Amino acid sequence: MLRSSFTQSRQLLLSQARSRTAAQWLPKAGASNRLAGQRFFADAKPPVTGAPTPASPSSESSIPPETVPKPSPAAEAPLPPPPPPAPARKTGRFRKFLLYLILTSGFAYGGGIFLALKSDNFHDFFTEYVPYGEDCVLYFEERDFYRRFPNTLRNQNRAPKDEGHTVTIPSKSGLSWKVAEEESGADVSQKGPHMSALDNGDKAQLKPGAAKPEEKVATVEKVKAESAAKEQTAEDKKKVKEEPKKPAAPAVTPIEFATVSEGDEEVVQELVKTFNDIITVIGADENAHKFSGAVNKAKEELRTIGEKIIAIRNEARKAAQEEIKQAHATFDESARELIRRFEEARAHDAAQYREEFEAERERLARAYQEKVNTELQRAQEVAEQRLKNELVEQAIELNRKYLHEVKDLVEREREGRLSKLNELTANVNLLEKLTTDWKEVIDTNLKTQQLQVAVDAVRSVLERSTVPRPFVRELVAVKELAAGDPVVEAAIASINPTAYQRGIPSTSQIIERFRRVADEVRKASLLPEDAGIASHAASLVLSKVMFKKDAVAGSDDVESVLLRTEHLLEEGNLDDAAREMNTLKGWAKILSKDWLSDVRRVLEVKQALEVRLGPFTSLFHLYR
């Protein structure tokens, strides 16, 4: 019973927890769906690998896994559904294309309209081939026109034009000033029988084989009827032309021209001239008397207009004269006011300049007075100081005279045993000087002797050793005894460190090693620079059978160089022997390279001992 109730209560609790979990997951799922469409800096999270957590001693349980109750299937909460995949982001290519197309079209139309307004050729091309180009150009031209002529929009109260009914005046419908004259002869170009014959001939050109007999008969009858009708028409016209001429119309009384004597304006004269031309045209017409009333009325109006223009001009002249008089009065008043202001400003400036001048004059006078006082004070001080100096000089001169007199008196008193005190003092000073000089000579001699002993120790090590022996301690002793002398430092620095660390061979060792090297050089004397194994073998065999020859002066062959080097070594001239061996080339020089390096070290040491340390030894012999 207890178990069943416990199970039921557990299932109830699990169901409530499951409902709460589902209710909590729903808003979270909606939020994840809303956030899926947004972009953040870290949309794609790296996959989290489930690394095994190491078991700690505290986490280990003493309960065996068999006794742990397994969770019931109802206790497992269902997993929330996975969020839907993020929708694909729109690229907006069509919008970009449409935007670029609109911008490009706008720039193209704008540039085209600008060029069309500047160039006539491009204007024709743009308005003819570009859609809506003519409307755009007309719109901007109207805007430019209204900008240049803004008064065109003011007279909007005028009656609109009646463009609905168009009046057409046919040609040759008016009157002419010439009297109609009859033509003197026949005009061949007018229509008549001769023209109809040609037309009928063209119409009658048919294929003879293609026409039927009935059509031929009908065509002939039709042509006969037309020719008869045309002949009748020609006879009627001839009768009309043969009628007698009517008498000409009587001459029309000419209309007087309009004159405006007072109108000397150019516009009025042009208007009168135009009106007179119209009168001339009307007077040449037969019905000129019909227009005489209108012409006279126009003359009166023209004369009235001239009088009005003259009146307006007189009024404008009077108004201009009044304005000129008023401007003159205003100008005179302004000039008087300007002169008054100028006088006031000049008086004010003069007073100000006078005050400044007085102040500056007082300042300069005060400064000059101070300068004069300072100069007088300095001159007085200089004079007083000069007097003091003269008094001091006189006092010094008196003291000198007094001392001289006292000295003379003392010298007279010394004529006895104190007469040679000065000579004794001079001799004592000379002895002190000689003692000091000899002390320096003795110290230098002692130092030179010690240095000579150290140098002799180095030489004895080099000459008496049968094998190369290092002489580092001897060189250290020489360096310490030199006490920082630059010559000794340079001599020691010129020696190769390998020479005094490992030692140098003696002259006998150098000669002995030269003989061994000479044998090897003779074996390789016949080898070229790029010799192989066969060349080495051939050179070895030939060197055994070669005859030794005497050294020839100026010869640079291997045998001569070796002989000259051997003679120089026997004489003890290592420098010239090294120079001779250095002239070898090829394999001979390569084989003698080690021997040359040893000789070079020996020469460096000897040069340092003889050339650089030689002056110290000569100085020692000099003092000894």
UniProtKB/Swiss-Prot annotation:
- Skewed-composition ranges (Pro residues): 66-87
Q: Where is the composition biased (Basic and acidic residues)?
A: 212-246
- Keywords, comma-separated and alphabetical: Coiled coil, Membrane, Mitochondrion, Mitochondrion inner membrane, Transit peptide, Transmembrane, Transmembrane helix
Its BP terms in the Gene Ontology are: cristae formation
The record's subcellular location field reads: Mitochondrion inner membrane
Compositional bias (Low complexity)? 46-65
Q: How does it sit in the membrane?
A: Single-pass membrane protein
Q: Where is this region: Disordered?
A: 42-89, 180-249
Cite the ranges annotated as topological domain Mitochondrial matrix. 42-96
The stretch annotated as transit peptide is: 1-41
Question: Could you list which ranges are Mitochondrial intermembrane topological domains?
Answer: 118-624
The membrane-spanning stretches of this chain are 97-117
Coiled coil start-end: 295-440
* A GO cellular component annotation in the UniProt record: MICOS complex
Family per UniProt? Belongs to the MICOS complex subunit Mic60 family.
SUBUNIT field: Component of the mitochondrial contact site and cristae organizing system (MICOS) complex.
Role description = Component of the MICOS complex, a large protein complex of the mitochondrial inner membrane that plays crucial roles in the maintenance of crista junctions, inner membrane architecture, and formation of contact sites to the outer membrane. Plays a role in keeping cristae membranes connected to the inner boundary membrane. Also promotes protein import via the mitochondrial intermembrane space assembly (MIA) pathway.
Q: What is this protein called?
A: MICOS complex subunit mic60
* Gene (UniProt): mic60
